[in-house]
UniProtKB/Swiss-Prot annotation:
It comes from Pan paniscus. One of its GO terms (biological process) is homophilic cell adhesion via plasma membrane adhesion molecules. PROSITE patterns: CADHERIN_1, CADHERIN_2. It is a single-pass type I membrane protein. Residues 26-139, 140-249, 250-355, 362-466, 467-570, 571-673, 677-795 form the Cadherin domain. Residues 834-1347 are cytoplasmic. Residues 1057-1091, 1097-1116, 1325-1347 are annotated as: Disordered. This is Protocadherin-11 X-linked. It holds the Pfam family Protocadherin. It comes from the Eukaryota. GO terms for cellular component: plasma membrane.
Length: 1347
């Protein structure tokens, strides 16, 4: 094992030594003309690569021959073994080394890349090509003529033209032989300094011209190769007369240098020769020897007379760096003089470097395809740069032009490897066009560039891409068919078959053209005539062979030029544009395109509108049509006119086109109700109508068209009990349930009709008045309902808003956020102000409590209360609220279950304001039995006295006794000051809120009347203790207006007096309003209902959400701190001026406190549901404590900012909704104000301003009442705004978080709910955890707080 490990390490080290340089050279010798598949060498062995184990490589070792694209290599190499073989290509030394001097070796070089990258090396292999005798020596001519004078001496030598053999060495010319010389001439061979063998003819005998003047013989030349090769030429010798002297050159060897850029005609050298003869024999003739090459003869000119050598053609040092010119000077004799002129052509930097790219990675269509996951340093190509110039002009550097993930690494002189320098990413770059730059060191330097394209391989998800996005071609008319116009080309980022591109003509291509599918050459196949067509615009498609194939196209524009003999041509004979009717003036309607087949000014077209149509304008150059009018499709649906096009020729030509502009409908019309025509249409619905019956049909029309005119109907308000439903398409209003007694009355259903327009739907609303009754004979009732329907607007179920753009939503959200922030700041400010202003008044209230004449408390109780107060002050606990519960229940004389009246006194113990805040005072119902007088309308207990023990021996007629004998016409019902004890009209089952979930003790008092009747007693609250006492009540006559007979019923009275409370809240707004207290209006529901909140419906019973009855859609939320409806009561001194002694003893009632009949026309006598207290008014219905502040009721007015929700009027008051007590009245149901301010919990008006539905402020701006309820763990905020509308003051609910249904009230309905003469409210009380019986359409079941 150790031996193997050592061998492996040695092999690796050896490989590192072998390949440390990154490049190697290896020489082999071969002979020319070698046959194919001859083994030359083995690189694996010769380079010792067999020592490297294959297991150490990621891939097997590979030998790759690197050669220039297009070259035919003379050898091949086995990629797996590294063996080198010859190919079928001929190895011709004379051809490969034609420009090399004969005395130099001939080499053939190739590069071999050894892969993989771990052992990559580039090996340069040099093959020395040995010459073989494959060429015979040849004379320059087949006949050689020479002249010899007759007096030539024996052994005289005359030079003959030498033969030439391309072979070298022994394979070259070795011997000359003279055949058939007749022993007169002989042949000698001499060797020149250059190594050439020159034949010389020797005269062996005397010559006699008169005897023989011509000799003909043969000359043979032989080489020394094997087999030996030879050739012959005819030698013809002429004998001439005697010429004693021969010419002599002044210089026999001349060497000159001349730059290769010397112009033609430049003198190279001047030869000088002399002859001793005279006359004709002294004339010297200069000529080139036959040994001068043809190239030299082509480049240089020799003046035969003067001997001047000049440049005949431009020289090129890179082709032939030097030239040997053998010049002969002859005087006509047989012995010419010889002079050798060596012309050296000096180098000039006139050649740019050349870049030779030899790919290691085989390219595809001259593009190297690389996978994006190839490793770093992957070898791509071998770059060889050369320069034919010499010295510094031939020194070349190579580099790339910009930052790319590839680099050039030098390996040999002027050779570089292109390899990856960073990881490739197909998603970032799909292909690279690498520009290689080569520059020499000349002055100025010359450079050359070459492009190398690399594609990153990926999946076939790319369509072919044309190199040009738009091809423009011009061709003259009357062309010959078959002319090639242009060649289009496209590339595809994919690879393989997916990158193979076929070129096709598009479907719009005319038949005059054809396209080569493979090359993309576009050809004209027909003769073109510009008069028929001046230009062609079509597409050429490039489609790959993928599945499915992907295509791309390029637009080709072929233009033909001719004279102005064509009129402008519209692209269409008629134009139809469609524009929305809300297109602004000068907006863009459309574009008219005109073409003119002519050229230049003749094709300059000017557009105009005919018939002086001023409604539209057209740009004379661009053809853009713009309107000068505003469109209205409902007025005109289309416009038609003609556009004229005129060219700019001398004799202008014109044409016209019809333009029709169609106005497209935009949803700019709201649906308009046809049925009912107004908000004052009434429909009678009989109570016996079966469910599912269509009771009414609404109909609305929309002036728009299409979906903008499609109308859908929905009920959005007034249908609180879900008694009706509407078909959204037909508008049919259907009765959903059987009507019962509680459903009788006028139902004001708010119906919305909205269209289906996009993007914004428009809508309209209408009030459908459905009168559920047996008949319409009761004119008084109908008139009253109609009157109230005009005063009590309808509450929408949800906010109806015309949805606009998302931007408007953002604006609304921003406005709401700002308004909320301002509201919070205002509330905090008001709270601080109220607390500051209450401090002195609370002290005064405590002082006044000591002088209270309302009830004399038991000393024990007083002492106990004071101790509790001290204890609570130490604990910093919230102060208790004083809650007074007064409940009177009356039974009819004919009630078989009645066994007499029993008076029950419930005293709540330790009721804290937190407990009170958690109780749902609004939604907990209390029910009176039928036909009992409405007592809650005028009596409320607001006593500030502490809890006390009831003394049974107290005289019955005592003013301060808890049981009062009341006349039957006195409608007396009182509850705690926080809960709602409202009166209702003729509805026998209307509901009132009277309940409190606290622990109390009950003192039942049985009341006996004549005759005794059985009654059922239900306690409002659980009692700890019970004591029964019997009290007789003498019924009093009722008012005439009520039409009742005295003595037929008794009433049950129950007082609830909380123990130890120092605070109370007044009436929750119960009691009917005087009909005359509202300013009557003749108009209906204002259309601005989204800004106002209304009542859901008005019924004969006037049971609304604002009169204190149980709200069928409100949901009790445990922990919700409910604010009290606050009523400020006047002092007894103020009331005693209008009341009888009986009122002062038994309490105020309709008989004594209010007039017998109501004057509806006397608006100046309008009164509120509460009276203003005169000082001392020491306590408010909500007392500000240290945190947590449990309740805040504030009405934002001009200072002082301490008003609450009720209205204050000067006497004579018409209705009282609370119990009035004898002075000192030290506790009120409103926030305390310093005297003589009459703005306690109500806004005070001095007559004759008597509109109860309106609140007077220091400014006409609407004020905001913010009702804030907070809890330790949850925050519920109700913000109620009051605005002065046409129908009265209306509240706007800003949202109640955590409430199932928003509550909507108006001041008029809140404070003056009804004026009906019959007021019967059945009353019921609840024990803890008892649930109220929900009415139809209730919210989830209301529960009392577990406390």
């Amino acid at each position: 094992m150790d031996l193997l490990s050592g061998t492996y390490i040695f092999a690796v080290l050896l490989a590192c030594v072998v390949f440390h340089s990154g490049a190697q050279e290896k020489n082999y010798t071969i002979r020319e003309e070698m046959p194919e598949n001859v083994l030359i060498g083995d690189l694996l062995k010769d380079l010792n690569l067999s020592l490297i184990p294959n297991k150490s490589l990621t891939t097997a070792m590979q030998f790759k021959l690197v050669y220039k694209t297009g070259d035919v290599p003379l050898i091949r190499i086995e990629e797996d073994t590294g063996e080198i073989f010859t190919t079928g290509a001929r190895i011709d030394r004379e051809k490969l080394c034609a420009g090399i001097p004969r005395d130099e070796h001939c080499f053939y070089e190739v590069e071999v890349a050894i892969l993989p990258d771990e052992i990559f090396r580039l090996v340069k292999i040099r093959f020395l090509i040995e010459d073989i005798n494959d060429n015979a020596p040849l004379f320059p001519a087949t006949v050689i003529n020479i002249s010899i004078p007759e007096n030539s001496a024996i052994n005289s030598k005359y030079t003959l033209p030498a033969a030439v053999d391309p072979d070298v060495g022994t394979n070259g010319v070795q011997n000359y032989e003279l055949i058939k010389s007749q022993n007169i001439f002989g042949l000698d061979v001499i060797e020149t300094p250059e190594g050439d063998k020159m034949p010389q003819l020797i005269v062996q005998k005397e010559l006699d011209r008169e005897e023989k003047d011509t000799y003909v013989m043969k000359v043979k030349v032989e080489d020394g190769g094997f087999p030996q090769r030879s050739s012959t030429a005819i030698l013809q010798v002429s004998v001439t007369d005697t010429n004693d002297n021969h010419p002599v050159f002044k210089e026999t060897e001349i060497e000159v240098s001349i730059p290769e850029n010397a112009p033609v005609g430049t003198s190279v050298t001047q030869l000088h020769a002399t002859d001793a003869d005279i006359g004709e024999n002294a004339k010297i003739h200069f000529s080139f020897s036959n040994l001068v090459s043809n190239i030299a003869r082509r480049l240089f000119h020799l003046n035969a007379t003067t001997g001047l050598i000049t440049i005949k053609e431009p020289l090129d040092r890179e082709e032939t760096p030097n030239h040997k010119l053998l010049v002969l000077a002859s005087d006509g004799g047989l012995m010419p003089a010889r002079a050798m002129v060596l012309v050296n052509v000096t180098d000039v930097n006139d050649n740019v470097p050349s870049i030779d790219i030899r790919y290691i990675v085989n390219p595809v269509n001259d593009t190297v395809v690389l996978s994006e996951n190839i490793p770093l340093n992957t070898k791509i190509a071998l770059i060889t740069v050369t320069d034919k110039d010499a010295d510094h002009n031939g020194r070349v550097t190579c580099f790339t032009d910009h930052e790319i993930p590839f680099r050039l690494r030098p390996v040999f002189s002027n050779q570089f490897l292109l390899e990856t320098a960073a990881y490739l990413d197909y998603e970032s770059t799909k292909e690279y066009a690498i520009k290689l730059l080569a520059a020499d060191a000349g002055k100025p330097p010359l450079n050359q560039s070459a492009m190398l394209f690399i594609k990153v391989k990926d999946e076939n998800d790319n369509a072919p891409v044309f190199t040009q996005s738009f091809v423009t071609v011009s061709i003259p008319e009357n062309n010959s068919p078959g002319i090639q116009l242009t060649k289009v080309s496209a590339t595809d980022a994919d690879s393989g078959p997916n990158a193979e591109i076929n070129y096709l003509l598009g479907p719009d291509a005319p038949p005059e053209f054809s396209l080569d599918r493979r090359t993309g050459m576009l050809t004209v196949v027909k003769k073109l005539d510009r008069e028929k067509e001046d230009k062609y615009l079509f597409t050429i498609l490039a489609k790959d062979n993928g599945v499915p194939p992907l295509t791309s196209n390029v637009t080709v524009f072929v233009s033909i030029i001719d004279q102005n003999d064509n009129s402008p041509v519209f692209t269409h004979n008629e134009y139809n544009f469609y524009v929305p009717e809300n297109l602004p003036r000068h907006g863009t309607v459309g574009l008219i395109t005109v073409t003119d087949p002519d050229y230049g000014d003749n094709s300059a077209v000017t557009l105009s509108i005919l018939d002086e149509n001023d409604d539209f304008t057209i740009d004379s150059q661009t053809g853009v049509i713009r309107p000068n009018i505003s469109f209205d499709r409902e007025k005109q649906e289309s416009y038609t006119f003609y556009v004229k096009a005129e060219d700019g020729g001398r004799v202008s030509r014109s044409s016209s086109a019809k333009v029709t502009i169609n106005v497209v409908d935009v949803n700019d019309n709201k649906p308009v109700f046809i049925v009912p025509p107004s908000n004052y249409s009434y429909e009678l619905v009989l109570p016996s109508t079966n469910p599912g019956t269509v009771v009414f049909q609404v109909m609305a029309v929309d002036n728009d068209t299409g979906m903008n005119a499609e109308v859908r109907y929905s009920i959005v308000g007034g249908n609180t009990r879900d008694l009706f439903a509407i078909d959204q398409e037909t508008g049919n209003i259907t009765l959903m349930e059987k009507c019962d007694v509680t459903d009788l009355g006028l139902h004001r259903v708010l119906v919305k009709a909205n269209d289906l327009g996009q993007p914004d739907s428009l809508f309209s609303v209408v009030i459908v008045n459905l009168f559920v009754n047996e008949s319409v004979t009761n004119a008084t009732l109908i008139n009253e309902l109609v009157r109230k329907s005009t005063e009590a607007p309808v509450t929408p179920n949800t906010e109806i808003a015309d949805v606009s753009s998302p931007t408007s939503d953002y604006v609304k959200i921003l406005v709401a956020a700002v308004a909320g922030t301002i509201t919070v700041v205002v509330v905090i400010f008001i709270t601080a102000v109220v607390r500051c202003r209450q401090a002195p008044h609370l002290k005064a209230a405590q002082k006044n409590k000591q002088n209270s004449e309302w009830a004399t408390p038991n000393p024990e109780n007083r002492q106990m209360i004071m101790m509790k107060k001290r204890k609570k002050k130490k604990k910093h606990s919230p102060k208790n609220l004083l809650l007074n519960f007064v409940t009177i229940e009356e039974t009819k004389a004919d009630d078989v279950d009645s066994d007499g009246n029993r008076v029950t006194l419930d005293l709540p113990i330790d009721l804290e304001e937190q407990t009170m805040g958690k109780y749902n005072w609004v939604t907990t119902p209390t029910t009176f039995k039928p036909d009992s007088p409405d007592l809650a309308r005028h009596y409320k207990s607001a006593s500030p006295q502490p809890a006390f023990q009831i003394q049974p021996e107290t005289p019955l007629n005592s003013k301060h006794h808890i049981i009062q004998e009341l006349p039957l016409d006195n409608t007396f019902v009182a509850c705690d000051s926080i809960s709602k004890c409202s009166s209702s009209s003729s509805d026998p089952y209307s509901v009132s809120d009277c309940g409190y979930p606290v622990t109390t003790f009950e003192v039942p008092v049985s009341v006996h009347t004549r005759p005794p009747m059985k009654e059922v007693v239900r306690s409002c609250t659980p009692m700890k203790e019970s004591t029964t006492m019997e009290i007789w009540i003498h019924p009093q006559p009722q008012r005439k207006s009520e039409g009742k007979v005295a003595g037929k019923s008794q009433r049950r009275v129950t007082f609830h007096l909380p123990e130890g409370s120092q605070e109370s809240s007044s009436d929750g707004g119960l009691g009917d309003h005087d009909a005359g207290s509202l300013t009557s209006t003749s108009h209906g529901l204002p259309l601005g209902y989204p800004q106002e909140e209304y009542f859901d419906r008005a019924t004969p019973s006037n049971r609304t959400e604002g009169d204190g009855n149980s709200d069928p859609e409100s949901t009790f939320i445990p922990g919700l701190k409910k604010a009290a409806e606050i009523t400020v009561q006047p002092t007894v001194e103020e009331a005693s001026d209008n009341c009888t002694q009986e009122c002062l003893i038994y309490g105020h009632s309709d008989a004594c406190w209010m007039p017998a009949s109501l004057d509806h026309s006397s608006s100046s006598q309008a009164q509120a549901s509460a009276l203003c207290h005169s000082p001392p008014l020491s306590q408010a219905s909500t007392q500000h404590h240290s945190p947590p502040v449990t309740q805040t009721i504030a009405l934002c007015h001009s200072p002082p900012v301490t008003q609450t929700i009720a209205l204050c009027h000067s006497p004579p008051p018409i209705q009282v909704s609370a119990l009035h007590h004898s002075p000192p009245l030290v506790q009120a149901t409103a926030l305390h104000h310093s005297p003589p301010s009459a703005q306690a919990s109500a806004l005070c008006y001095s007559p004759p301003l008597a509109q109860a539905a309106a609140i007077s402020h220091s400014s006409p701006l609407p004020q905001v009442i913010a009702l804030h309820r907070s809890q330790a763990q949850s925050s519920v905020s109700l913000q109620q705004g009051w605005v002065q509308g046409a129908d009265g003051l209306c509240s706007v609910d800003q949202g109640v978080q955590g409430s199932a249904t928003s509550q909507f009230y108006t001041v008029s309905e809140r404070l003056h709910p009804s004026d009906d003469s019959i007021k019967v409210i059945p009353l019921t009380t609840f024990t803890p955890r008892q649930q109220a019986r929900p009415s139809r359409g209730d919210s989830p079941v209301m529960e009392e707080h577990p406390l």
